Amino acid sequence: MQPTAIDSKSKSHPNERVAFIQACWHKDIVDQSRKGFVAEMAKQGYAESDIDIFEVGGAFEIPLHAKLLANTGRYAGIVGAALVVDGGIYRHEFVAQSVVSALMQVQLETEVPVFSVVLTPHHFHAGEEHQKFFFDHFSHKGEEAAKTCADTLNKVRSLRRLDAQQKAAC
């Protein structure tokens, strides 16, 4: 059987929906990732109405929501966004790593692509300089996530189509 090329440039995504889950901690900053994501997805051919927004208390709640949403079969992709900072009580790196690892597990178990904008800085304080930096940084990361999301959904769609064609040929 001859290998078939994968068309990863197609922007045809009828009825594809994306879920965007964001933590409410540091909401003003995390909101920037959502805004950047939605704006870039529009450039990629998705309507704002193709994106459902969900808010959860903190980063730790994102993986469960991602899995429940993936299991609905409604979403082609899911994004999780949070800012995990050192509150001086526990190791924030552990929380961020746990969340990102759980998001990876969700996508592997459900075969629904999951994207992370769960970020943890080395140092964070609520001063004006840090606020501006993280506003801009989260907006940029939201845009990056959108580009990756649109590209991955195109590729996954093509791979599934290829798989279906090969199964039909057998």
UniProtKB/Swiss-Prot annotation:
Its EC number is 2.5.1.78. 5-amino-6-(D-ribitylamino)uracil binds at residues 25, 59-61, 83-85, 116. GO terms for molecular function: 6,7-dimethyl-8-ribityllumazine synthase activity. Signal peptide: none annotated. Gene3D superfamilies: Lumazine/riboflavin synthase (3.40.50.960). InterPro entries: LS, LS/RS, LS/RS_sf. The active site is at residue 91. The keyword Transferase applies. Pathway: Cofactor biosynthesis; riboflavin biosynthesis; riboflavin from 2-hydroxy-3-oxobutyl phosphate and 5-amino-6-(D-ribitylamino)uracil: step 1/2. Pfam families: DMRL_synthase (PF00885). Keywords: Riboflavin biosynthesis, Transferase. (2S)-2-hydroxy-3-oxobutyl phosphate binds at residue 130. It catalyses: (2S)-2-hydroxy-3-oxobutyl phosphate + 5-amino-6-(D-ribitylamino)uracil = 6,7-dimethyl-8-(1-D-ribityl)lumazine + phosphate + 2 H2O + H(+). It comes from the Bacteria. GO terms for biological process: riboflavin biosynthetic process. GO terms for cellular component: cytosol; riboflavin synthase complex. Belongs to the DMRL synthase family. Forms an icosahedral capsid composed of 60 subunits, arranged as a dodecamer of pentamers. HAMAP family: Lumazine_synth (MF_00178). Catalyzes the formation of 6,7-dimethyl-8-ribityllumazine by condensation of 5-amino-6-(D-ribitylamino)uracil with 3,4-dihydroxy-2-butanone 4-phosphate. This is the penultimate step in the biosynthesis of riboflavin. PANTHER family: 6,7-DIMETHYL-8-RIBITYLLUMAZINE SYNTHASE, 6,7-DIMETHYL-8-RIBITYLLUMAZINE SYNTHASE DMRL SYNTHASE LUMAZINE SYNTHASE. This is 6,7-dimethyl-8-ribityllumazine synthase 2. It comes from Pseudomonas syringae pv. tomato (strain ATCC BAA-871 / DC3000).
